[in-house]
Amino acid sequence: AIVIDPGQAEPVIAYLEEHELELTSIWTTHHHHDHIGGVAELQESYPMTHLVAHTEHNVDEDQTIKDGSTVSAWGCAAQVWDVSGHTASHMAYILDIDGQKHCFCGDTLFSAGCGRVFTGTIEQLHESFKRLNGLPAETLLYPAHEYTASNLRFGLSIEPTNEAMQQALIQAEEKTAQGGPTLPV
């Protein structure tokens, strides 16, 4: 299995054990603790795990990545894109699985929102949005956090009559009330 941005080890280990999977690779998008907090414990539990990260992600990576790198595991190859803005060294992983594009974009882009600018710049974030916007429309986006409903509530506090946001919030709340995710988008 490949794990992206393990903020905690325990839920990952529980999932792997429940589904009888072996962790072989960890990929990180950026250095914030809620994305790398479980890396060390996962490496202890699965010592053969291959860690893929940018040099500024504060982990001891086996493979250093940058914009344009390619990473692979279990027959899946991903293009690495620099999508800085939230942080100065934020990476995304773009996979093509059976003709369907999948983008793991960390905190650069959320459903109905984006990550705050910390060590990056607003100009970098804008360039990253333009780059991500160039992906095919049918690309599935996997943001790192499930903030859809809260982002839509915030949007509605600014534009309370926005019918598209109202409808999207109803759908998001229905999905989460049933125990389902609103992601990917």
Residue locations for each model-derived region?
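Generic enzyme active-site microenvironment
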Residues: 3, 105, 143
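Short active-site oxyanion
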Residues: 1-2, 23-25, 138-140
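Active-site metal-binding loops of divalent metal-dependent hydrolases
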Residues: 6-8, 31, 56, 86-87, ...
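Accessory terminal helices/loops
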Residues: 127-140, 147-185
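Active-site HxH/HxHxD metal-binding segment of metal-dependent hydrolases
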Residues: 6-82, 101
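Short beta-strand-to-turn element immediately C-terminal to the catalytic PLP-Schiff-base lysine
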Residues: 4, 94-96, 155-156
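Ligand/cofactor pocket segment of small-molecule handling proteins
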Residues: 70-82, 87-122
